[in-house]
Swiss-Prot record:
LRR repeats lie at residues 961-982, 984-1010, 1048-1073, 1074-1103, 1104-1128, 1129-1156. The lineage of its organism: Eukaryota, Metazoa, Chordata, Craniata, Vertebrata. Zn(2+) 2 binds at residues 582, 585, 588, 604. The modification Phosphoserine is found at residues 28, 390, 394, 558, 692, 718, 731, 825, 832, 869, 883. Changing residue 212 to A: Abolishes histone demethylase activity. No loss of its ability to repress the transcriptional activator activity of the CLOCK-BMAL1 heterodimer. This is Lysine-specific demethylase 2A. It comes from Homo sapiens.
Amino acid sequence: MEPEEERIRYSQRLRGTMRRRYEDDGISDDEIEGKRTFDLEEKLHTNKYNANFVTFMEGKDFNVEYIQRGGLRDPLIFKNSDGLGIKMPDPDFTVNDVKMCVGSRRMVDVMDVNTQKGIEMTMAQWTRYYETPEEEREKLYNVISLEFSHTRLENMVQRPSTVDFIDWVDNMWPRHLKESQTESTNAILEMQYPKVQKYCLMSVRGCYTDFHVDFGGTSVWYHIHQGGKVFWLIPPTAHNLELYENWLLSGKQGDIFLGDRVSDCQRIELKQGYTFVIPSGWIHAVYTPTDTLVFGGNFLHSFNIPMQLKIYNIEDRTRVPNKFRYPFYYEMCWYVLERYVYCITNRSHLTKEFQKESLSMDLELNGLESGNGDEEAVDREPRRLSSRRSVLTSPVANGVNLDYDGLGKTCRSLPSLKKTLAGDSSSDCSRGSHNGQVWDPQCAPRKDRQVHLTHFELEGLRCLVDKLESLPLHKKCVPTGIEDEDALIADVKILLEELANSDPKLALTGVPIVQWPKRDKLKFPTRPKVRVPTIPITKPHTMKPAPRLTPVRPAAASPIVSGARRRRVRCRKCKACVQGECGVCHYCRDMKKFGGPGRMKQSCVLRQCLAPRLPHSVTCSLCGEVDQNEETQDFEKKLMECCICNEIVHPGCLQMDGEGLLNEELPNCWECPKCYQEDSSEKAQKRKMEESDEEAVQAKVLRPLRSCDEPLTPPPHSPTSMLQLIHDPVSPRGMVTRSSPGAGPSDHHSASRDERFKRRQLLRLQATERTMVREKENNPSGKKELSEVEKAKIRGSYLTVTLQRPTKELHGTSIVPKLQAITASSANLRHSPRVLVQHCPARTPQRGDEEGLGGEEEEEEEEEEEDDSAEEGGAARLNGRGSWAQDGDESWMQREVWMSVFRYLSRRELCECMRVCKTWYKWCCDKRLWTKIDLSRCKAIVPQALSGIIKRQPVSLDLSWTNISKKQLTWLVNRLPGLKDLLLAGCSWSAVSALSTSSCPLLRTLDLRWAVGIKDPQIRDLLTPPADKPGQDNRSKLRNMTDFRLAGLDITDATLRLIIRHMPLLSRLDLSHCSHLTDQSSNLLTAVGSSTRYSLTELNMAGCNKLTDQTLIYLRRIANVTLIDLRGCKQITRKACEHFISDLSINSLYCLSDEKLIQKIS
């Protein structure tokens, strides 16, 4: 046999693959997990939730005085909007109009109703889904968090005017920060204030949101613009909140309807045009009976602060993600204290910059002291931005996302922050002085009225002070607008002491205490809008350092060329450009034509151009002409792009001496002479470092090729340490090898072995490529099959050998092979990491040159085997991280040897072996090793366990006494076509009903002992032909059953008739402890014409108390019985059993072992 043919067959043998097992990676964990098990329809129509918590009001009665009197504790419904002060779009306003106002590319958070998990869609995608007819919607999606402030929709929606008076965002948060907000989305990095005031909720029919409390204990206003809603409301009592928290932490939200666990719950239906106000802390669930469009918003206020703090603490304990929490919560609390102190005492604790921007304090002072004449001077005075503003005007706290160790010293060492002592407040009128301003209750008292706080506000402010004081330093989140938090706390305490005896009746003024001064009276000077640079803002309590700002580096001195002009395009000639998409890689899966969302906007991994060219429109930066090298080969007229300075010129247009460095992998690319000369010294130093690294790599790669007594690395000056493949056009193979000319008098055998080794490597590569080409041409199916190299590209790991020209000091025509690792992250081949492989001299023979030719040939054959094995070992080390063989290189013989070893290992030992390497992982997952899988009595069946079952394809699966759901079992049986034995003892009918479909495998054994909720109708559903695909098969899916276990079920003779009809092969039947079975049941099983009369071999009727001695007369008819268990049957006597045995012992011997256990003696 020719050596070449042998090598080809060897390469084909290396590519032997086994049949791929079925793995559905597209199934998400959410689809596997069991979800809602309670009946939502029953919750919608039952009269159980008939409590009365909601108050119906007229809009004119909802004012600040009402809130001051009651504290906004009860849910409110307004049947019409008269007197509320709300403004809504036209009645025909649709979701498509919402898209036009907020933008079709606006990303919205969409909730999958079935899994209660969130995904993202664009408004255009959501609109298409919303307008899809109901019967064509595959899933139920719900949008409940589209915040539309700072969009065109903002001015079309106005919330109740009373909410404007009490909302902390409008009255407590520095208004200049809110006015500086320009971002319309809720991106936290661009958020200047808690952006939660206006939401648009869009729900389709059937959407359900489980019980929840709005984030941060916020209250909610809610207007039904189109459609309707159904609410379940639970009051926020201490007991109910404890139940709610335990319910959240239990993870059983899909199994437990919280309204059934509390003593009082109200279901209320909201119709179109209703406005609903939900107070702080109320636990509620929402159902959408028809497609609905709702406008609403969240707000914090001062009349229920304890409840708001309590809900925020619950969110802390239940680990609610920061994305779903109230932004800047504790920063808002600090501003609340500051605003109360200022509005009651005229003393501000804001920094000077914040006073200017939000309070306009400088202008107010000048206006009061100087009159109109000074106002002109104020107008003439330029308003300058403090240098601190670029760092400190962000609402992020000093203590959040920074270095906490030096926090106290750093924040108080700023020169503009003055520490104010609160101890001598009674005698010093300048105690509240900041930035030159002096305010004191005695020096500048309020002139209009005596202030009285409601008991709701007093209690809330006390709780707020206690909470902020109890926070550790890294969680205080003091905003940068507060100059001295300690002085602020001291002032609030004094203020609360002074107002502790406020008259409750005088506090009902109908006017909020905290209001911003009006700017129109102060003649605020106009100025152009300036976007204030801010530091990056993250969630206030994430404990994660803020992302470091990338310093802006000065631009290079090279000419600025437009990025669009420099962007390269496809060559349309290489193999990658002319082939189609693979449909397998992550880019293809993202494409819309393959069913993906189409977000990446990237081409297939296999279609990434190997040699992208410059676009036709690019011109020379010196002469302005386009590429003149379309027909000629003149290098001087060819446009070249420098890979360093990105300058595009004709080489002939450069008027300078020196040489450039041509990039042979990328067309029209070089290092221009200017950049090449400047960087030559650095390149030389870098090249030395790379050579030293390459030597270390060579020692690892070629270690199997050396003997134990050889040094690990060849002498660095040895010419044979570099493999040179020299192109020879005369050679029939196109490539010949030669040793280095300076090798000297080395061993002849060593040199010849080197050449043979090099030749074998090259021929093996060429033969593999030719085989791939032939397989592609001879593909009879016409379908595109991926080569091994392409499959490896998609997998992300493969090793190929590419030929490159060496460095300048080597001969110009020599080519150096380099080992190239193709990874999925590489954009194309030129970016792949490269490792230079050097071949060292082979082991010096012990027998010298005088030995005969025969000995030399024998030695060559031995070396070929050694080289092949060493080569495989080296490749495995590079590619497998320690594994002995990889996908294409694994040996079938080696696999079978190891399989014979793995058969003796236990399940735990197999799992340990799977951790060794990828190959062992694949071998240990072989279904021959996992014919039986036992998960009985597992507390929870997780998605990972289900995926593991699918990989192993068991024949017998035990899920007894588990809480597996119907969806999980359906997912399993659809993907286990070879399943024969299924044990579901102790499971519920809701799960077992998954076997009533046409996808149920043909089982041999089914164990339903002591299953919950299974009676005659359920057995009928199991045994009758499935109705989900009529006309497909009119036979039962359990027709091959040989072992049926029904112990402990409430079944009657109707079930036995079904068994006789649909199970002709049944040999073992377990009917123990079925209390409804009688003697007539035994008569049915053994009647003339029944299949069980001849097929049954084992019958278990233990514990059936209604059986009598007459049963034994009927059981004599069973032809091939080997075991009858009648233990526990109180009405059957031992004497009758003995008589029964004597009748059966005519042809075979039977014995009575134990009490009433009849067995055949084999």
